[in-house]
């Protein structure tokens, strides 16, 4: 079997194709969740915490030079090291929302999945059947 035919057999297996479709749909779904977090949830959280964009919450690890605005991008451009906890919290919230939605989807999928009936017990081998018949005949 040639290398190309082995690769073709591997790539066209159901699991690989299913995984590829899942990754593509997951990437598109991730963009939707990013939009929900960044455009809908975080502005509300920012309004609760004083109207500042939540992504701009940071702690400067060195003194900010005079004349540099107190905004994350400006401080980073000035070369000041920062602890950008607002951006981190946004990403954590994004992950939690995505994980919760995936949990709900898996839970619904498991609910819709029909319970497979238990497989019928395997028939005993012919030798066992013959030995049982002999045993039953001797008991009579």
Curated annotation (Swiss-Prot):
It is a multi-pass membrane protein. The chain crosses the membrane at residues 16-36, 86-106. InterPro entries: Mechanosensitive_channel_CS, MS_channel, MSC/AndL, MscL_channel. The keyword Cell membrane applies. GO terms for cellular component: plasma membrane. It holds the Pfam family MscL. SUPFAM superfamilies: Gated mechanosensitive channel. It is found in: Cell inner membrane. Homopentamer. This is Large-conductance mechanosensitive channel.
